[in-house]
Design a protein with these regions (language model features):
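Alpha-helical scaffold/interaction cores of sigma-54-like transcription cofactors
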Residues: 1-649
Length: 649
């Protein structure tokens, strides 16, 4: 007790007026004794007391589910006797398991807390006092970027962000002279549009950082991919060497990458050969400092099948019965047990409508509901607890590719942690939350195909004395296309599956654009449009455009809407959408955002009517888009990966 009082006074001397004593009441004997002692000290030294509750679950009824979760985490069975007398969470006693003392560790209401501390009413008042003192952590702030060093010549403004933009502008036009033989008015207009958008959003530093580590990687002999995702739609990125695909040649759109009407975080992901990836990460850590670079945490949650199996193990259901019960859940990623049990079977928002369950899967869902309703069936309790635990965090991991680079020590900006499988700090926030906090996330990906290409080129040089620059090979090589036409694509990146080989033999691709289209079409959803694409290429099916104005944009894909970029361009051409509007439409169609689409439809029809297009035709175009545009693919990404595939062949 004397030691406790000395510690009490030590903290009081440090914090003074901001020192409070926390009281919790969970009906635990040891806690009752400690509270009495703390109240004595508080009275003796005139220290304020506050009331809190140690909440580990929301509702009191979830206490058992929480106990099961503890058993899952510790590998115990719930039938194992509980160890309630402990002074240390890490204490282990043979034949007993860790458990909470009772069911009082839930989120209590204001009235419950007031009643619980009715003998110490000031504890509630002082709790509110602390709330008033707390400064809210607002994650919404200006983009957080390291100060990228630039030559003194470009430090012409008081604002570092503007100076970085001046340097980026210089590098872009210098790079454009090398990329393009002649910079015509169209090139200049596109470059200026992109630079203006980058300047407005304050992202120049981001481009410089990515350019720098890609350049460093190449200098170290690391193989870097030609680009990935929507960033390949940027001419600025192409001119400064971030990407290696000319966006203007393939009609790739910058606004697919950065929407000029809506500030959103840029996202440039980069592929490296397997060995080179770590060397580039090491370069970044050395340049910016270990305290400013972190990997991203991932949270593994309990999915439908997992929650059933985990709960069944804890509740000692035989494995055979556990497996049989979990088999009633369809083998589909993202399927929800709560939806299977509680969603309507038919009609709007039903299992038939949203999940599109087969008759057998629908019958299994009904079986699960029957089991839950049968209170005498032990499996009913398992389902009941599995429903509560579905979505709970089961484990943490480290994102395979994600990295953040901060302008200062990360401990001053976001919560961080350490992980046994990472040499770097790990964020406690996941990627989406990190980005909403204006911390830049970048993906450093290892691509085995680049390692294969690198090895092949080294062997050619070693055995034949020929050095090949794989990034400048001609894209009209007849022999290469013959491989594709015969379906001889074993080991060829993205084109090696038997289904793809079958379609390649039918398509007989003879131009690079065919490979881009096939890369975009060969995936669930648009797969059914491949036969139409093939027939139209070979003239076995006529190409019909709803409006003549659509031909310019859809001609390359024989009238089939393959790419998101085509929808974006058509909306601008037919309905005078801005570049920003077009990107908003693309995103809404891909994510099936009905409320946004309803507004955009009215705008589209009105814009078309202004341009004297028949409303009926425009309605049909919109309906076609709604049916297919959710499957339309990112042309920038497809072009980059078709290029890697061509290099592989």
């Amino acid at each position: 007790k004397e030691e406790a009082e000395a510690t009490f006074k030590w903290w009081l001397d440090i914090f003074g007026e901001d020192y409070y004593i926390e009281l919790q009441r969970h009906d635990i004997p040891d806690q009752i004794y400690v509270n009495d002692t703390l109240l004595q000290y508080a009275k003796k030294y005139n220290v304020k007391v506050i009331a809190t509750n140690d909440a580990h679950y929301v509702d009191q009824a979830d206490a058992n589910a929480h106990d099961i979760l503890l058993c899952i985490n510790t590998g115990e069975k719930q039938a194992t006797p509980k160890m309630k007398d402990f002074g240390d969470d890490d204490m282990m006693v043979k034949g007993k398991r860790f458990a909470f003392y009772n069911d009082q560790f839930y989120f209590k209401t204001q009235s419950e807390m007031t009643n619980l501390f009715e003998d110490v009413p000031q504890a509630i008042d002082y709790t509110n006092e602390i709330v008033d003192k707390v400064q809210l952590l607002d994650l919404k702030r200006d983009i957080l970027l390291p100060a990228f060093p630039i030559p003194p010549t470009f430090k012409i403004h008081d604002d570092d962000v503007l100076n970085q933009w001046e340097y980026l502008k210089h590098l872009t036009f210098e790079g454009a002279k090398k990329r393009y033989v002649d910079i015509d008015a169209e090139h200049e207009e596109r470059i200026n549009f992109e630079l203006f958008t980058i300047k407005t959003m304050g992202f120049a530093g981001y481009f410089l950082i990515v350019m720098d580590f890609i350049r460093a990687g190449r200098d170290m002999g690391v193989f870097v991919g030609p680009g990935r995702g929507s960033a390949a739609g940027s001419v600025v990125a192409y001119c400064i060497g971030i990407t290696n695909i000319d966006p203007m040649k393939y009609n790739l759109l910058f606004e697919r990458f950065l929407n000029p009407d809506r500030k959103s975080m840029p996202d440039i992901d980069t592929d490296f050969d397997d060995d080179g990836r770590q060397r580039v990460i090491d370069y970044v850590v050395e340049k910016y400092g270990k305290n400013q670079v972190a990997q991203l945490i991932t949270y593994g949650t309990m999915a439908a099948k997992t929650s059933i199996k985990d709960v069944a193990r804890v509740m000692d259901l035989p494995i055979s019965e556990s497996n049989a019960l979990s088999k009633f859940v369809p083998e589909r990623p993202g399927i929800s047990l709560n939806r299977l049990i509680y969603a309507p079977l038919s009609g709007d928002g039903s299992l038939a409508d949203k999940e599109n369950l087969s008759p057998d899967e629908m019958a299994n869902a009904k079986t699960l509901r029957s089991i839950l309703e049968d209170q005498k069936d032990v499996r009913s309790n398992i389902l009941k607890e599995a429903l509560v635990l579905e979505g709970s965090v089961r484990n943490t991991g480290v994102h395979a590719a994600g990295l953040i680079i901060a302008p200062s020590d990360l401990t001053d900006l976001i919560p961080i942690a350490v992980a046994k499988d990472s040499n770097l700090y790990v964020t406690q926030f996941e990627g989406e939350v990190i980005e909403s906090g204006s911390v830049i996330k970048m993906d450093f990906l290892g691509l085995r195909t680049l390692s294969i290409i690198k090895t092949a080129l080294n062997l050619i040089k070693q055995n034949h004395g020929v050095e090949i620059d794989i990034d400048t090979i001609p894209l009209d090589d007849v022999t290469t296309f013959e491989l594709y036409q015969h379906g001889e694509t074993n080991g060829t990146f993205q084109f090696e599956s038997p289904g793809m080989q079958k379609y390649l033999k039918e398509l007989k691709p003879d131009k690079f654009e065919d490979l881009i289209a096939m890369n975009a079409l060969y995936r669930p959803g648009p797969l059914e449009y491949i036969p139409t694409y093939i027939k139209r290429k070979h003239g076995r099916e006529s190409i019909v455009y709803d409006l003549p104005e659509m031909e310019e944009i859809l001609k390359e894909t024989y009238g089939v809407t393959v790419y998101q970029e085509q929808v974006m361009l058509l909306s601008q051409r037919l309905a005078n959408f801005t570049k920003g509007d077009a990107d908003t439409l693309r995103k809404a169609m891909g994510k099936k955002q009905k409320d946004v689409l309803d507004k955009m439809k009215s705008k589209f029809i009105a814009g078309c009517e202004k341009n004297n297009f028949a409303p009926k035709v425009c309605e049909k175009i919109w309906t076609d888009w709604e049916a297919f545009a959710q499957y339309a693919f990112n042309k920038s990404h497809s072009t980059c990966y078709a290029f890697v595939a061509y290099q592989t062949a």
